[in-house]
């Protein structure tokens, strides 16, 4: 183990140019390629990274869902629903009474969050999907 530790200590003291020269000499002496050994590792990392990048991709369209409306808050929620959807009084009332129900679909994140906040301030429970 002492030999290995000595080699590690010597490698730590190498400059960048000396390390590059060492790699070149190892390639020639042992007939190996440092790039060929590193390429599969990089390819695996790149493919794993690409998969996670797709999973991390942020959603751009949201659906605002009215989950629950307490009976004593129906009128306030009804006003918010009408403002968000542009529905008439009867249509908005039917929508509020049919909860859980989507209020609006395909909204931007900012609009959906603002609508959710308005509904919650009026007393309703809302979610984004």
Curated annotation (Swiss-Prot):
Its main location: plastid. Residues 101-129 are annotated as: Disordered. Transmembrane segments: none annotated. Gene3D superfamilies: 3.30.1390.10, Single helix bin (1.20.5.710). It is found in: Plastid, Chloroplast. GO terms for cellular component: chloroplast; cytosolic large ribosomal subunit. Signal peptide: none annotated. GO terms for biological process: translation. The keyword Methyltransferase does not apply. Residues 101-123 have a biased composition (Basic and acidic residues). The keyword Ribosomal protein applies. SUPFAM superfamilies: ClpS-like, Ribosomal protein L7/12, oligomerisation (N-terminal) domain. One of its GO terms (molecular function) is structural constituent of ribosome. Keywords: Chloroplast, Plastid, Ribonucleoprotein, Ribosomal protein. It comes from the Eukaryota. Homodimer. Part of the ribosomal stalk of the 50S ribosomal subunit. Forms a multimeric L10(L12)X complex, where L10 forms an elongated spine to which 2 to 4 L12 dimers bind in a sequential fashion. Binds GTP-bound translation factors. Belongs to the bacterial ribosomal protein bL12 family. Forms part of the ribosomal stalk which helps the ribosome interact with GTP-bound translation factors. Is thus essential for accurate translation. This is Large ribosomal subunit protein bL12c. It comes from Guillardia theta.
């Amino acid at each position: 183990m002492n030999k290995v530790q000595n080699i590690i200590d010597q490698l730590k003291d190498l400059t960048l140019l000396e390390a590059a020269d060492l790699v070149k000499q190892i390639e020639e002496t042992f007939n190996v390629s440092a790039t060929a050994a590193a390429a599969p590792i990089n390819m695996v990392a790149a493919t794993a990274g690409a998969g996670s990048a797709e999973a991390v991709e942020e959603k751009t369209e949201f659906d605002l869902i009215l989950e629950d409306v307490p009976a004593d808050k129906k009128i306030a929620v009804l006003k918010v629903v009408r403002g968000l959807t542009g529905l008439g009084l009867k249509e908005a009332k039917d929508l509020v009474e049919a909860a859980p129900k989507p209020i609006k679909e395909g909204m931007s994140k900012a609009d959906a969050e603002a609508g959710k906040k308005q509904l919650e301030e009026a007393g309703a429970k809302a979610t984004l999907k």
